[in-house]
Amino acid sequence: MNKQTAHYHLPGLFEFYELYRMFLPLFREHREYFYDWCDIGSIYGAPPDCIWGGGRVSLEDHDAGEVLALLQEYGISARLTFSNSKLIEEHLSDRKCNELCALFAENTEPKNGVIVHSELLLQYLKSHYPQLYLISSTTKVLTDFEALKKETDREDFRYVVPDFRLNKAYEKLNTLTESQKDKVEFLCNECCYFGCKDRKECYEAVSRRNLGEEPDFSCTSPGAEEGYRFSKVMKNPGFISVGDIQKIYLPMGFSNYKIEGRGLGSALVLEFLLYYMTKPEYQLSLIHISEPTRRVVIS
């Protein structure tokens, strides 16, 4: 794997199918509009009503067969976000989640994966769907560097997404071995308050909602009521900019970068695609979304 290439892992596999249906041909046919040092490593997500789901509650859906066909056409790995941390044995027989895994396991090139939190689910997936690679979810909130190292040493995982508050621990990160660095996948654009003490509880609440429960949890972080604003996220101490990727992380030997946004609108996700992948001279004039058709057009 070329260490000078940034592999982006993008949000909204099901949620933003129409956006990617228009964007991916553009990315292939007009590659000169985009940075030559990056590509798309995967697109992740899950349809609504998946009890194995976690991280975010999915609201948008699209036919799984069409989703997979699109990504296979462009040689991009698809990832199911099955990071529910509250699963018990009886949940493992869920028909919808198993059918999705079976469908995703059919692809051999590129292989598809599953983002996972639960150890119970991890062992189940290894046993029943060994064709799928596994990613350790950021919902584990790995803020301790030694815990991150141990996670990267596990053969179970191809990638590990640490908590965003380890993003700027440069000295510690640089002590990782090459094989450990190959597994680290940084979450670049997290909006969560850097000093949040309830991040794990927040993710657990999402897991419970996906199981049909109504957890008693509300975010009390400063500015939470404002919603997601990319301009504000850029000021977060854990934010990883395009310049950071080029000048710091790639030279250090890190290649994988996750962009969050499953619970956001397609316009915001498009903004991320422009910022992280598109050359500045094209960012304002190259692509825009025409509502309500959501067509990606060249202007």
Locate the predicted segments by residue.
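Short active-site oxyanion
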Residues: 5, 109-114, 158-159
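Acidic/glycine-enriched edge-of-secondary-structure segments
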Residues: 6-10, 47-56, 220-237
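Active-site beta->alpha loop and helix N-cap motifs at the rims of alpha/beta catalytic domains
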Residues: 10-31, 38-129, 133-148
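Alpha-helix-loop-beta-strand connector modules within alpha/beta enzyme cores
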Residues: 63-76, 179-184, 188, 279-285
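Hydrophobic packing residues within well-ordered alpha-helices of enzyme cores
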Residues: 125, 151, 173-176, 276, ...
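Catalytic alpha/beta core domains of metabolic enzymes, predominantly
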Residues: 133-252, 257-269
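C-terminal helical cap(s) of enzyme catalytic domains, especially alpha/beta-barrels
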Residues: 267-285
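Single conserved hydrophobic/aromatic residue that forms the stacking wall/gate
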Residues: 287-299
